[in-house]
């Protein structure tokens, strides 16, 4: 190994601990203390909400710009003589 070069090995200890704990739980039927921190499949509460675009009110009061506008600010829309 060259001088100044070092190699690091990252070991996911928490993942390994949870994996072995779940294997022991399945094999031996024992409850481990780590079970209290994570909910099981049956304990997780899920709320399902159905959303539909048809339930939304449509835009009925849409302001339309008059075609007779001159485009200048401050004026009223009057027909030219």
From Swiss-Prot:
Signal peptide interval: none
Protein name per the record: Elicitor peptide 4
Spans annotated as Disordered: 57-81
Sorted UniProt keywords: Plant defense
Role played: Elicitor of plant defense.
Family statement drawn from the similarity comment of this UniProt entry: Belongs to the brassicaceae elicitor peptide family.
Disulfide cross-links: none
Site feature (Required for ligand-receptor interaction) residues: 71
BP term (GO), one: response to jasmonic acid
Taxonomic path: Eukaryota, Viridiplantae, Streptophyta, Embryophyta, Tracheophyta
Maturation-removed propeptide residues: 1-54
Organism: Arabidopsis thaliana
A Pfam family this chain is assigned to: Pep1_7
Keyword Chaperone part of the UniProt annotation: no
Keyword Transferase: no
Annotated gene: PEP4
